[in-house]
Amino acid sequence: MSSDHRDQYYWRAKRDQFRSRAAYKLEFLIERYGIIKDGQAVLEIGSSPGGWTQVLVDHGCRVVAVDIQPMDEIPGVIFLKLNILREDAAERIREEMARSLVQRFDVVLSDAMAKTSGIRSSDHAASVMIGNAVMKIAMDTLRRGGVAVVKQFQGDMTGDFIKNWGHYFRDHRITKPPASRKESSEVYIIFYGFSGKETDNSVQG
């Protein structure tokens, strides 16, 4: 196997016993942007195979993990096999919150992504669709002041995506972790300081 940029993270994940190299993307987001604090309640969307989940557990977080694909059990983690594009996705998650005595999540994280086609415009559009579904769930499950993080293939709809959802939050950042493939348009959009659904949607001049 070649020793290119991607393989460095592959072998690091093996050494550190992470289920995927994506764990280092989340570690970067935590260290650089402070997106979670130890012990917080976190909704993780797109969790399988569990690399991010392992990092969250290492930080003592209470995790509800969601994915359309199955995921091997991680002690202390609640897993829901669920398609977030379903109309009742938010309701299913709220039901689990009630069972788990979680009133609201401190953080909503998403590493969810559709299978890529290799057609940049199509992959971008699919990532925006998933991102919108994630943010709709965040509107119903995130506490005021909370943080939402969404993965997206950056493209011509990214600006509108940030504009549409950004007015529910105090601030945002866009970043590409070092563990992301250099040739990929993958970015993570971080929204800070959720103000709640009932907010002033007027355009500020």
Curated annotation (Swiss-Prot):
It is found in: Cytoplasm. GO terms for molecular function: rRNA (uridine-2'-O-)-methyltransferase activity. Its main location: cytoplasm. The keyword Coiled coil does not apply. S-adenosyl-L-methionine binds at residues 50, 52, 67, 83, 111. Keywords: Cytoplasm, Methyltransferase, rRNA processing, S-adenosyl-L-methionine, Transferase. It comes from the Archaea. The active site is at residue 151. It catalyses: uridine(2552) in 23S rRNA + S-adenosyl-L-methionine = 2'-O-methyluridine(2552) in 23S rRNA + S-adenosyl-L-homocysteine + H(+). The keyword rRNA processing applies. Its EC number is 2.1.1.166. Belongs to the class I-like SAM-binding methyltransferase superfamily. RNA methyltransferase RlmE family. HAMAP family: RNA_methyltr_E (MF_01547). PANTHER family: PRE-RRNA 2'-O-RIBOSE RNA METHYLTRANSFERASE FTSJ3 (PTHR10920:SF13), RIBOSOMAL RNA METHYLTRANSFERASE (PTHR10920). Specifically methylates the uridine in position 2552 of 23S rRNA at the 2'-O position of the ribose in the fully assembled 50S ribosomal subunit. This is Ribosomal RNA large subunit methyltransferase E. It comes from Thermoplasma acidophilum (strain ATCC 25905 / DSM 1728 / JCM 9062 / NBRC 15155 / AMRC-C165). The gene is rlmE.
